[in-house]
UniProtKB/Swiss-Prot annotation:
One annotated Gene Ontology cellular component of this protein: cytoplasm
Organism: Bacillus anthracis
Entry protein name: Heme-degrading monooxygenase
Protein's GO biological process: heme catabolic process; iron import into cell
Summary of subunit composition and partner proteins: Homodimer.
Leading EC class: oxidoreductase
Gene: isdG
Amino acid sequence: MIIVTNTAKITKGNGHKLIDRFNKVGQVETMPGFLGLEVLLTQNTVDYDEVTISTRWNAKEDFQGWTKSPAFKAAHSHQGGMPDYILDNKISYYDVKVVRMPMAAAQ
């Protein structure tokens, strides 16, 4: 399993604009190898909002299949370029080495 994050610096007070874009079912949920998505808002930032989109995939090839799909291209075709509230962003890839799950409650 891999996790891919896209961490964006957003003009202060506008983090909700990016968060709202992900608060609906999209095409990524139908992609082979897609395991889930979380949208994270960093607490206690002073000068800007920081939003991280974290996606989980069976393999890097599955993520690459998503990025080459027509659905991805349509979702990321920002007319006029990147939205002006996004100051910067960084993509990171993580190999998942350990997964721990909660223990079932004792009966």
